Regions:
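Single conserved hydrophobic/aromatic residue that forms the stacking wall/gate
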Residues: 1-11
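Unchanged
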Residues: 9-114, 122-132
Length: 132
């Protein structure tokens, strides 16, 4: 899943190309190797003032990654099974800006995935559950 911010892009095709471009810039995956399945729901992130236009895509084989450490802190590949397993979705009580909040996150392969990525994965998980 690439979370292309798509700033200034208006049309879905532009967002799709932006997602492929971001995937290349951040991970080194050639855009010609990415088969886009389709878009997920755009997501506005108030804290960063970005609107994210996520897409789901697939690759025919495992890519040789060239990770840009300024953009990507870690890459791991959880299985579809672990993503759809109800035990991997968790909620943490926290304080944010003086308010009690519940923060949803995934624990996948002992990696915590939260924030915008968690929200995007939640939608993807719902789609997967609808087709399995």
């Amino acid at each position: 899943i690439d979370r292309s911010r798509g700033l200034g892009d208006v049309y879905k095709r532009q967002h799709k190309e932006a997602a492929k471009r971001e995937t290349f810039e951040e991970l080194g995956v050639q855009s010609r190797d990415i088969n886009i399945i389709g878009p997920l729901t755009p997501l506005y992130i108030p804290i960063s003032n970005f609107k994210i236009f996520p897409f789901v895509g697939w690759l025919k084989s495992a890519p040789k990654l060239n990770i840009q450490s300024k953009e990507v802190s870690k890459v791991f590949s959880p299985s579809i099974y672990s993503l759809t397993d109800p035990k991997t979705k968790k909620i943490k009580d926290s304080i944010l800006l003086g308010q009690k909040v519940q923060i949803p996150f995934f624990n996948l392969k002992n990696e915590v995935v939260w924030g915008a990525t968690s929200m995007i994965l939640s939608e993807f998980k719902k789609i997967l559950k609808g087709i399995t």
